[in-house]
Amino acid sequence: MKTLLLTLVVVTMVCLDLGYTRRCFNQQSSQPKTTKSCPPGENSCYNKQWRDHRGSITERGCGCPKVKPGIKLRCCESEDCNN
């Protein structure tokens, strides 16, 4: 009986996908592509671009941060959407 109950709990968790987290790219500028699993409840990714003395800079990650004027920001809500 305990085995049946445990099996039902596991199947329910798998079917409901309770542990789902968003995955976003998180590399900086021209670095090799890397991804990161976002914290639970964080459902968006961002791509932030600006220029400074080093040239054009790109930052990617989880969430949708507030930015200062002059910084381009694109937020999205699907897997790996911020490349």
From Swiss-Prot:
Cysteine-cysteine disulfides: C24-C45, C38-C62, C64-C75, C76-C81
PROSITE patterns, sorted: SNAKE_TOXIN
InterPro entries on file: Snake_3FTx, Snake_toxin-like_sf, Snake_toxin_con_site, Toxin_cobra-type
Alphabetical UniProt keywords: Acetylcholine receptor inhibiting toxin, Disulfide bond, Ion channel impairing toxin, Neurotoxin, Postsynaptic neurotoxin, Secreted, Signal, Toxin
Compartmental location: Secreted
Annotated tissue distribution: Expressed by the venom gland.
Lineage top rank: taxon: Eukaryota
Function, in words: Binds to muscle nicotinic acetylcholine receptor (nAChR) and inhibit acetylcholine from binding to the receptor, thereby impairing neuromuscular transmission.
Protein family: Belongs to the three-finger toxin family. Short-chain subfamily. Type I alpha-neurotoxin sub-subfamily.
Name listed for the protein in its UniProt record: Short neurotoxin D
Species of origin: Laticauda colubrina
Lineage summary: Eukaryota, Metazoa, Chordata, Craniata, Vertebrata
